[in-house]
UniProtKB/Swiss-Prot annotation:
Subunit structure of this chain's protein: Part of the 30S ribosomal subunit. Forms a bridge to the 50S subunit in the 70S ribosome, contacting the 23S rRNA.
CDD domains: Ribosomal_S15p_S13e
Gene this chain is encoded by: rpsO
Keywords (A to Z) from UniProt: Ribonucleoprotein, Ribosomal protein, RNA-binding, rRNA-binding
UniProt name for this protein: Small ribosomal subunit protein uS15
Amino acid sequence: MALTKERKNEIIEAYATKQGDTGSPEVQVAVLTEQITTLNDHLRTHKKDHHSRRGLLKMVGRRRNLLTYLRNKDVSRYRSLIERLGLRR
């Protein structure tokens, strides 16, 4: 199932650095992570859905680029985001 507006707004509020913040790397990575998780569950049941798999790989690449940017810009923000999202165990 796709990400609903309500769920997306919850994620934005949880990871925003200030009021109305939708473009910070933290928010973008959090939204992408939620979309990746949802799409991953979809692909577990629909193994031959290659179009969605391609979209998943694009999202993973975009998230990786944003995380690299954040790591180079501010390591403490990067580490706290990784810990909050449960990435890189």
